């Protein structure tokens, strides 16, 4: 069996394409089942977010798996293969597994180390699992990817440093003034950046937040979400009088807060420090306001340097996670190799079970007066003996599948236990395919 992923993301496709090729919640269930029902596909999981749509499949032949997965995606959204293919990426085997681990860990995200994608992958997997479109391979692979991602985030701290300007603004405020719980904070602008800033402030413990915006309704919408108050931007001067922190992010073409506005506010503020953080481009606050006594003014360039430093830290942590991923995939590939001998193990267990049943039937004929309890006790002991006898042979055959001379070892094993030769042919074919895939990957890496 082979793992293939076909998809597109923010690196390969513009938003105009991504919004066309996106599975909504209402269609996800039907889509993942329909994908599994395509020719040559045995397991399927679909991950679809605003930044990516990815189809993971287990297939018996990589080339047919690729083709039918691409065709399914094009047909589902009413596109031709020619229209869709320029925006697609395709990974197979090791590369497909590595991609899943990187996505789940947040290493493939626009903001490296973000955790939202972890929940999205989990939801996609659980949906597929409930619909029984996953099996032996994906049940193990996705669980291991999720487990590694959780552990990596907990142990490396990759998500701790702010890497967006709005988050960096809040981090800077905490560094300079300490806890935000008792601070009066003014947010100017209720657009996407202003809303994200308000969210970050609220999550940092701020509860005295006032949002100013040209459109009062938009200010109220943002403020109400975070227990704040809202005012028209025309009332901003009153907000400056009591604010400890001002974070501004409007789309104005010129400065909306003049030096004299800050100077006037300072007359009523005693000796309290006044922190102004301007994350707008063009700038919202006149730069000369920072020259006033007690005023500390930072602009987007100051924050960009913080973001760059933090991103460098995240990339160091990301490198640690990459090494964990490599180790996890190597272990998973070893497990995949043993799948080729699963039919042999099953046959050996079936033979043992048949012997147990025949022996039990013989005992019942010779000892017709046995009670049900006696039969149960004897049956349990027979099963225990068989399991103990099989433990070493089963351990041997699993290890043998990963050895250089696996084919010879398995043939000897089959001959020893008088197992069906067709099972050996199936196992040998699977191991050859796995070896070819590994050899191809190593050749590419060289």
From Swiss-Prot:
Additional information: During catalysis, the active site Cys acts as a nucleophile attacking the alpha-carbonyl group of tRNA-bound glutamate with the formation of a thioester intermediate between enzyme and glutamate, and the concomitant release of tRNA(Glu). The thioester intermediate is finally reduced by direct hydride transfer from NADPH, to form the product GSA.
Annotated keywords: NADP, Oxidoreductase, Porphyrin biosynthesis
Record pathway: Porphyrin-containing compound metabolism; protoporphyrin-IX biosynthesis; 5-aminolevulinate from L-glutamyl-tRNA(Glu): step 1/2
Protein name: Glutamyl-tRNA reductase
SUPFAM superfamilies for this protein: Glutamyl tRNA-reductase catalytic, N-terminal domain, Glutamyl tRNA-reductase dimerization domain, NAD(P)-binding Rossmann-fold domains
Residues binding NADP(+): 189-194
Positions bearing the site annotation: Important for activity: 99
Species name: Exiguobacterium sibiricum (strain DSM 17290 / CCUG 55495 / CIP 109462 / JCM 13490 / 255-15)
GO biological process, one term: protoporphyrinogen IX biosynthetic process from glutamate
């Amino acid at each position: 069996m082979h793992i293939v992923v076909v998809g597109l993301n923010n690196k390969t496709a513009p938003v105009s394409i991504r919004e066309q090729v996106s599975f909504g919640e209402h269609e996800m269930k039907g889509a993942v089942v329909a994908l599994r029902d395509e020719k040559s596909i045995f397991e399927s999981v679909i991950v679809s977010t605003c930044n990516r749509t990815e189809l993971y499949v287990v297939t018996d032949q990589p080339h047919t798996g690729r083709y039918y997965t691409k065709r399914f995606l094009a047909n589902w959204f009413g596109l031709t293969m020619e229209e869709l293919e320029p925006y697609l990426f395709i990974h197979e085997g090791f590369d497909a597994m590595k991609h899943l681990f990187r996505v789940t860990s947040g290493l493939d995200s626009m903001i490296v180390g973000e955790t939202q994608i972890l929940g999205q992958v989990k939801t996609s997997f659980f949906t597929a699992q409930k619909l029984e479109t996953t099996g032996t391979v994906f049940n193990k692979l996705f669980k291991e990817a999720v487990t590694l991602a959780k552990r990596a985030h907990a142990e490396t701290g990759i998500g701790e440093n702010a890497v967006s300007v709005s988050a960096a603004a809040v981090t800077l405020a905490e560094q300079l003034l300490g806890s935000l719980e008792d601070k009066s904070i003014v947010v100017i602008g209720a657009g996407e950046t202003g809303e994200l800033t308000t969210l970050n402030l609220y999550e940092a413990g701020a509860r005295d937040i006032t949002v100013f915006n040209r459109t009062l309704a938009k200010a109220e919408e943002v403020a109400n979400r975070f227990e704040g108050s809202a005012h028209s931007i025309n009332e901003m001067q009153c907000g400056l009088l009591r604010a400890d922190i001002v974070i501004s992010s409007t789309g104005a073409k010129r400065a909306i807060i003049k030096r004299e506005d800050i100077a006037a506010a300072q007359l009523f503020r005693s000796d309290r420090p006044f922190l102004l953080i301007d994350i707008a481009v063009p700038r919202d606050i006149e730069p000369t306001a920072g020259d006033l006594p007690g005023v500390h003014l930072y602009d987007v360039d100051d924050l960009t340097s913080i973001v760059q430093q933090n991103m460098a830290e995240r990339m160091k942590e990301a490198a640690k996670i990459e090494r964990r991923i490599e180790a996890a995939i190597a272990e998973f590939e070893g497990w995949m190799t043993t799948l080729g001998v699963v039919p042999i193990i099953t046959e050996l267990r079936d033979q043992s079970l048949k012997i147990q049943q025949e022996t039990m039937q013989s005992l019942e004929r010779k000892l017709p007066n046995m009670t049900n309890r006696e039969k149960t006790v004897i049956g349990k002991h027979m099963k225990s003996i068989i399991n103990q006898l099989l433990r070493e042979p089963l351990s041997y055959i699993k290890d043998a599948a990963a050895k250089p001379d696996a084919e010879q070892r398995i043939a000897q094993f089959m001959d020893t236990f008088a197992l069906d030769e067709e099972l050996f042919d199936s196992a040998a074919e699977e191991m050859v395919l796995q070896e070819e895939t590994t050899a191809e990957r190593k050749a590419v890496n060289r």
